[in-house]
Structure formats: structure tokens, C-alpha cells
Design a protein with these regions (language model features):
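Conserved RNase H-like, two-metal-ion catalytic cores of nucleic-acid enzymes
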Residues: 1-58
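Hydrophobic "anchor" residues on beta-strands that sit immediately upstream
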Residues: 5, 61, 92
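Active-site flanking residues adjacent to catalytic metal/cofactor-binding acidic residues
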Residues: 8-10, 65, 95
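Metal-dependent phosphoesterase core characteristic of DEDDh/y 3'-5' exonuclease domains
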Residues: 20-35, 67-169, 174-178
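Conserved short-loop catalytic and cofactor-binding motifs
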Residues: 40, 63, 149
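Active-site-proximal or metal-binding-adjacent scaffold patches in catalytic folds
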Residues: 181-183
Length: 183
């Protein structure tokens, strides 16, 4: 049976997990079905982390963009802050596409937008990750459009990461086959 793959992306109020919180997390199957989980208030973070942990249990492989350097350490830190077990994230087979691009391709730049341009993957032009902290402050003040903007940004990142994953699949077949054998 093929490994069940999920693309993961998170939205946060800071690049540092001791200074910020998780405000949203997106999951998308390799078939393209997406789901967005959000914290409408900072006090919702613990339940968001629990919900995300539970959702990830049904997948064999996590695929991220720069997840090894950001998403997973951020999630690990926030889980531990709330007394939750980080091991489900840490034990999951993980393919970081940013690492794959850096080690297997020879591109001028290796950030997601450039890789999407290289593979002619269309992206929505909207808020960027750096806009999330400001948007979240607006959302906390009741601005529903700001909350929706964060959601749309996350889902766009997921769609782009999924498309890059499909392009790079020949380069990660061995990791997928290994995960298949483990499931």
C-alpha cells in the first residue's frame, strides 16, 4: 500500500517559538485535499496543537518546505511549552523539499517562490508569511478579512508545496518507498 503523504505548513506570529505562537496549520493530501486549522485567539493554541497532532496520526509521511529548519522545531517548542508530547511529529517520516532542492538541484535561489517560478507553478499574489503577525493582531481585534488572509496564504503555500512535491517525486521515491515499508 502506498505511503499516505501529507503536506504541512504552519503560520506563526514570530520566527522564534519562545516569542510567538502558532496561529494556523494547513494540511493537504498529495491528492490535493486541504484542511486549515486555526487559533482564533492565542488561548486556542494548545487545542490547535492537539488537533494537529491527531490529524497527523493517519499519515505516514510529512512533506514540508523548510520544515526541518522551521515548522518542526517551532511545533516541537510550542508542544513542549504546553506539556504536549512532540514525539508524534519527531517520529514521523519527513521530507523537507527545501533540503531536496538544495542538495539535488542547482538553482540560483532555493526559496519557494523561485522554485515555483522555475517549475512554472502559479501562485496567488497575496500576503506573505512576514505579514502574518500584523494580520493576526488585526484578526484578534475582530477583522475577519485578516483571519481569512492568513488562511488563504497558508493554503496557497500548501498548493505550491504540493505542486513542487509532485515535480520532485522522482527525487524522493526512495524515502517514500521506505515509509511504505514502515506503514
Amino acid at each position: 500500500m502506498p505511503a499516505k503523504v501529507v503536506i504541512l505548513d504552519i503560520e506563526t506570529t514570530s520566527l522564534e517559538a519562545d516569542a510567538g505562537v502558532l496561529v494556523g496549520a494547513g494540511l493537504m493530501s498529495d491528492a490535493g485535499r486541504g484542511e486549515y486549522l486555526e487559533a482564533r485567539r492565542t488561548s486556542d493554541e494548545k487545542s490547535l496543537l492537539s488537533k494537529l497532532s491527531n490529524r497527523l496520526e493517519s499519515y505516514d509521511v510529512m512533506v514540508t518546505w523548510n520544515g526541518r529548519g522551521f515548522d518542526i522545531p517551532f511545533l516541537t517548542t510550542r508542544l513542549m511549552k504546553h506539556g504536549l508530547d512532540p514525539r508524534p511529529f519527531l517520529r514521523k517520516s519527513h521530507i523537507d523539499l527545501a533540503d531536496v532542492v538544495k542538495s539535488r538541484l542547482r538553482l540560483t535561489f532555493t526559496y519557494l517562490d523561485h522554485v515555483c517560478d522555475f517549475f512554472q507553478i502559479n501562485r496567488k499574489k497575496g500576503p506573505m508569511g512576514l505579514d502574518v503577525p500584523h494580520l493576526y493582531v488585526l484578526a484578534l481585534e475582530g477583522d475577519r478579512k485578516a483571519l481569512l488572509s492568513i488562511r488563504e496564504h497558508c493554503l496557497d503555500d500548501l498548493r505550491a508545496t504540493r505542486q513542487v512535491f509532485l515535480k520532485l517525486k522522482p527525487l524522493v521515491e526512495q524515502q517514500l518507498e521506505y515509509a511504505e515499508g514502515q506503514s
